[in-house]
Design a protein with these regions (language model features):
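Tubulin/FtsZ superfamily GTPase core signature
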Residues: 2-380
Length: 380
């Protein structure tokens, strides 16, 4: 994580019962030492597991108004989850059917490997069967390693076998969250293959299956074609997806961070964020920086830039809820004309949502007006 002083680049055996009396009770064996091996058991192995605080992953060091955890499923999901882990979201798990796709820098404590499997071979039906059969292993890992989180962000790559099968685990995620009395929901973040990748019928079919499966849940779709188009020519092929994953993670992390802060102008708080995230359907997240906000068309510029520069497909129709978070310099908020433009921009974007939550935050060294836009509860 970046230095917080540098604001330029911020964005979880019963005691033995009294034995029944015997007809020929010659000796009291109640206090007799009993070993597991006397019963033909392997020591430290049993149906009832004992959990300790030592099993819990460290608390998130990244600031967040929400008690949040991340789970990456499959190769693509593992890489997306790793981007959040590197930002300080320590309550992150990587679930996979093969260890070959786990990023090399991820500690073993964050990894959950499905036993007796070595990948799914892009077979979603088989993937769903494997994940369903091993749901108890994943549920135990969630409870033991994450403890209690209120919001669970599940990341998966569309096109592969394991990631595209992720919704087979939805009952597991919900059962875990009920067991720890979570107040939030499961939010999916799934990727859509590039145009070239979609030429492969199996990849295209798997991606479509995943997109359809998450439709009824809160979800974000990241279009890899848009991501690579934005980075092509500036980033080499090897670093393209890691950079795209980091960009999305940083943008979402800023929303989580800013919602912890008070603003002398207008705050976007945790309840606002929860209201946005709780809407079922697709969500859009985009951001932009505008060097000179001294324009009467600031609202349309923000909306246009956020849509064109986001990895998410542009929203269609009116969102059930949304948020516009602005980060401005002291000079901007002190300028009456710019302040009026900021108010107009919030109203303009608000017309695209049934309910818009907004926040305006001041930073000393901000290089331009930063805008982070989310639109939630989209029907498509």
């Amino acid at each position: 994580m970046s230095d917080p002083k540098d604001n330029k680049n911020e964005f979880d055996f019963l005691p033995p019962a009294e034995p029944p009396p015997s007809f020929n009770q010659e000796k009291d064996h109640y206090h007799e030492q009993v070993d597991a091996e006397d019963f033909g058991m392997v020591e430290d192995f049993g149906l009832q597991m004992e959990y300790s605080d030592e099993d819990l992953l460290p608390e998130n060091t990244a600031p967040s108004s929400l008690n949040i955890g991340f789970v990456g499923v499959g190769g693509g999901g593992n890489k997306m989850a790793n981007a959040f882990l590197e930002l300080g979201f320590n309550k992150t798990l990587l679930v996979n059917t093969t260890g070959k796709d786990i990023p090399k820098n991820v500690a073993e404590d964050h990894v959950v490997l499905i036993p007796d499997s070595d990948g799914i071979g892009k077979n979603v039906d088989y993937g769903k069967e494997v994940l369903s059969q091993n749901g108890a292993i994943i549920e135990d890992a969630l409870r033991i390693k994450l403890g209690k989180v209120d919001w669970l962000v599940v990341l998966a790559g569309g096109g592969g076998g394991t990631g595209s099968s992720v919704t087979a685990l939805h009952p597991v995620f919900e059962r875990y969250m009920r067991s720890v009395q979570s107040s939030g929901k499961v939010v999916y973040v799934v990727s859509w293959p590039t145009a070239q990748e979609n030429l492969n019928p199996t990849i295209a079919r798997n991606a479509l299956t995943l997109a359809n499966d998450v439709t009824k849940h809160p979800h974000v779709i990241l279009d890899n074609e848009r991501s690579t188009r934005l980075l092509r020519g500036r980033i080499g092929m090897l670093g393209m997806y890691p950079v795209a994953n980091t960009q999305f993670a940083k943008s979402f992390a800023q929303v989580l961070k800013l919602s912890t802060e008070d603003s002398p102008i207008q705050s976007f708080d945790s309840k606002d964020l929860e209201t946005c995230l709780s809407n079922d359907g697709r969500a859009f997240l985009g951001s932009t920086m505008i060097k000179d906000p001294n324009t009467a068309k600031l609202g349309s510029v923000i909306l246009h830039n956020c849509m064109n520069r986001s990895s998410c497909p542009p929203p269609k129709g009116k969102a059930a809820a949304g948020s516009l978070i602005l980060v401005a310099s002291e000079e901007m908020v002190a300028d009456p004309k710019v302040s009026k433009n900021l108010e107009s921009a919030i109203s303009y974007v608000g017309g695209r949502c049934e309910t818009l939550f907004s926040g305006v935050y001041v930073r000393k060294n901000v290089p331009g007006l930063i805008a982070i836009l989310s639109m939630n509860g989209l029907k498509q």
